[in-house]
Amino acid sequence: MRVYLIDGLRLNDYNKLENYLDKHLESSPLGGIYWLKLDQEILTDIQKEHNDCHSHVFALMLEETSLSSEFLVRITKKIQCDCMACATKEQRIWLMEQVDAIFEKLDIHI
């Protein structure tokens, strides 16, 4: 699986990210995982058709020294569905831009 990985976080960076993600994103029952909801405009046709599966998300995994996300569009309501898929190029770029914007907002420079 391809991933977007930012490593080399300092403890202060980790704390800022954890506070921000706790405040702005839904968290998974598994600690350190947050759901970043995709914009409707970048969903694939099948993802748009699957209203029962919304929201489509990327899973951000925060660890003490890194933040990562698989390039996999997931759903939170079911274990598996045809609308779960590897991210398109547009979705991958969107994810990286969203994460980079969070780092910029929090003044984290890696």
PLM region descriptions:
Residues M1-L17:
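Terminal, regulation- and interaction-focused segments at domain boundaries
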Residues R2-L5, S28-I33, K77, Q91, ...:
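Long, compositionally biased, intrinsically disordered segments
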Residues V3-L5, I33-K37, V57-A59, S66-S68:
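Ordered hydrophobic segments in well-structured contexts
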Residues L11-N12, Q40-L43, E64-L67:
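Short, charged/polar surface micro-motifs in flexible loops or helix N-caps
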Residues N12-N15, L43-D45, T76-Q80:
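Short, surface-exposed beta-strand/loop "edge" segments at domain boundaries and coil↔beta transitions
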Residues N19-S27, A101-I108:
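Short, intrinsically disordered, mixed-charge
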Residues D22-V57:
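Ser/Thr-rich, low-complexity intrinsically disordered terminal regions
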Residues H54-I110:
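C-terminal basic regulatory modules in eukaryotic proteins
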